[in-house]
């Protein structure tokens, strides 16, 4: 099927879905939850094909981790779908209303965006998260995943479409671009006749390529050059715990720690202790000259390291003179995703939280919490790093827009 045909089908499916009531949408989602669990063996078989190809292509461990589905991860996907079903339906919600002096009533209500095109890389769970969020918020969605996850994505798409049709909804509510040629992406991001918004979920190169080609509004998500700043007033045991979690729990995700900033007054005491702990996880350290004085197995960082999202067990480290230098570095090199300060100083906490420009700013907690499920949104369609329309984890409400309904009785403007 051509991209144009997919766009036409999605537009029609969105019109039909806009008429679906909450009960029907929730029934579909509960059925999807059950179907994911019932078809776990089929999903894992298809996922194994992608994993075999990834290993043949010598892809990194972090990449393979993002690609891998397990029974536990399928269960987590199903739980996410259940959460989405349990959330209040935003469509038709009256955000505010008032009566005009001329007697008209004016209401602001939530409506679907329409047709969403989502382009993402190697995480197949996105197929289900994005599809479920789109359905609950009344949108049709066209997905274009990475070629490395094609078998898994097709399996998940098939399950989703079967459930939709079983409940009398169009299978075109969720479509997948199965042709992996790059030309199809260009066609997709210029299909402004049928698509209302593009959501790219991936690294800087993906977003840059789409920005250069797209003729459709875009919501940027994904790239996470996340920092943690260890202040001179930090509890060092707490700091080590936070850094280890943020860097090593799942290094291949966008909310993982990539760059560590350490106040010069504690670097000598803190860095050797941290290096011992990070060595247990085989984390490669790339440090500036000042930090190298206190590290035994680090290599000298290059200027490029401060702007790199490793998505792997690699960490850049820089010693800074004060909190102001830390904030300046973060606002220069960060991707406006998630940033953290570890400190027992109330004053420095407030300075950092107020002055760092990011979607999520933490005090004394791992950046790994920037996630739709952790924020209570169920699944997420992505983590927006821009400022317009949506910022941070994007759940159901972020996939809607506003519409004004004016009810009159013959009023005219004088």
Swiss-Prot record:
<keyword id="KW-0963">Cytoplasm</keyword>
<dbReference type="InterPro" id="IPR000965">
    <property type="entry name" value="GPR_dom"/>
</dbReference>
<dbReference type="GO" id="GO:0004350">
    <property type="term" value="F:glutamate-5-semialdehyde dehydrogenase activity"/>
</dbReference>
<keyword id="KW-0560">Oxidoreductase</keyword>
<comment type="similarity">
    <text>Belongs to the gamma-glutamyl phosphate reductase family.</text>
</comment>
<dbReference type="InterPro" id="IPR015590">
    <property type="entry name" value="Aldehyde_DH_dom"/>
</dbReference>
<keyword id="KW-0028">Amino-acid biosynthesis</keyword>
<dbReference type="InterPro" id="IPR020593">
    <property type="entry name" value="G-glutamylP_reductase_CS"/>
</dbReference>
<dbReference type="InterPro" id="IPR016161">
    <property type="entry name" value="Ald_DH/histidinol_DH"/>
</dbReference>
<dbReference type="InterPro" id="IPR016162">
    <property type="entry name" value="Ald_DH_N"/>
</dbReference>
<keyword id="KW-0641">Proline biosynthesis</keyword>
<protein>
    <recommendedName>
        <fullName>Gamma-glutamyl phosphate reductase</fullName>
        <ecNumber>1.2.1.41</ecNumber>
    </recommendedName>
</protein>
<dbReference type="InterPro" id="IPR012134">
    <property type="entry name" value="Glu-5-SA_DH"/>
</dbReference>
<comment type="function">
    <text>Catalyzes the NADPH-dependent reduction of L-glutamate 5-phosphate into L-glutamate 5-semialdehyde and phosphate. The product spontaneously undergoes cyclization to form 1-pyrroline-5-carboxylate.</text>
</comment>
<dbReference type="InterPro" id="IPR016163">
    <property type="entry name" value="Ald_DH_C"/>
</dbReference>
<keyword id="KW-0521">NADP</keyword>
<dbReference type="Pfam" id="PF00171">
    <property type="entry name" value="Aldedh"/>
</dbReference>
<dbReference type="GO" id="GO:0005737">
    <property type="term" value="C:cytoplasm"/>
</dbReference>
<comment type="pathway">
    <text>Amino-acid biosynthesis; L-proline biosynthesis; L-glutamate 5-semialdehyde from L-glutamate: step 2/2.</text>
</comment>
<dbReference type="GO" id="GO:0055129">
    <property type="term" value="P:L-proline biosynthetic process"/>
</dbReference>
<dbReference type="GO" id="GO:0050661">
    <property type="term" value="F:NADP binding"/>
</dbReference>
